[in-house]
């Protein structure tokens, strides 16, 4: 976490610089010197407020997660509470819209996933994000499916989101948001058909 006193204007500037440098040279080569140069600040500012590269990466991921949470929450607030399929689509859309689909954001996500396997604090952030996604999905899915079915489908959708993200990040053309939504909605439609047939 950044220390208190960091000017608010500097935080987004440094977060954007971090993602830009990771996009350009990768996580391991993204040095404090390169990031500070990109942001137009001294290395001392980064070291003072963030304690170095690790702290800056953590703050960058927190910002990406905040943006994701805000996008999904805003979309859900615009929909009726009983519009469950639309709300599921809103949760899916939030993971592939605008900011989240930018190349530099997706590459930072990929670096974060890799880093979090060996870092307790980043792993905790990843777990919080994962649990939030599953929780959002289960609230809606349990209104359509039996609890055990909803649990399986929620994890299926989450796995598709992660897998499409990974493939899109590794693709030079980036993430195809329309195709991502089509794939996941096709899966959801098939689950609806499958479990409806079982009830008949």
UniProtKB/Swiss-Prot annotation:
Residues 8-68 form the HTH tetR-type domain. Pathway: Amine and polyamine biosynthesis; betaine biosynthesis via choline pathway [regulation]. Keywords: DNA-binding, Repressor, Transcription, Transcription regulation. Residues 31-50 bind DNA. One of its GO terms (molecular function) is DNA-binding transcription factor activity. GO terms for biological process: glycine betaine biosynthetic process from choline; negative regulation of DNA-templated transcription. Signal peptide: none annotated. It comes from the Bacteria. Repressor involved in the biosynthesis of the osmoprotectant glycine betaine. It represses transcription of the choline transporter BetT and the genes of BetAB involved in the synthesis of glycine betaine. This is HTH-type transcriptional regulator BetI. It comes from Vibrio atlanticus (strain LGP32) (Vibrio splendidus (strain Mel32)). The lineage of its organism: Bacteria, Pseudomonadati, Pseudomonadota, Gammaproteobacteria, Vibrionales. The gene is betI.
């Amino acid at each position: 976490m950044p220390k208190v006193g960091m000017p608010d204007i500097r935080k987004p500037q440094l977060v954007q610089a971090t993602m830009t440098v990771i996009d350009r040279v990768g996580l391991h080569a993204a040095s404090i010197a390169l990031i500070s140069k990109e942001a137009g600040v001294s290395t001392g500012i980064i070291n003072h407020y963030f304690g170095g590269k690790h702290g800056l990466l953590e703050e960058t991921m927190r910002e990406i997660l905040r943006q994701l949470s805000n996008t999904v929450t805003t979309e859900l607030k615009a929909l009726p509470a009983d519009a469950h399929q639309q709300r599921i689509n809103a949760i899916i859309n939030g993971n592939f819209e605008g900011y989240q689909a930018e190349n530099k954001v997706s590459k930072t996500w990929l670096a974060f996933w890799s880093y979090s396997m060996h870092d307790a604090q980043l792993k905790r952030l990843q777990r919080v994000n994962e649990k939030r996604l599953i929780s959002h999905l289960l609230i809606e899915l349990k209104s359509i499916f039996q609890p055990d079915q909803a649990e399986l489908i929620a994890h299926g959708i989450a796995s598709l989101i992660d897998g499409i993200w990974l493939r899109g990040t590794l693709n030079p053309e980036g993430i195809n948001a329309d195709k991502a939504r089509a794939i996941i909605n096709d899966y959801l439609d098939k689950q609806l058909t499958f479990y409806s047939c079982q009830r008949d």
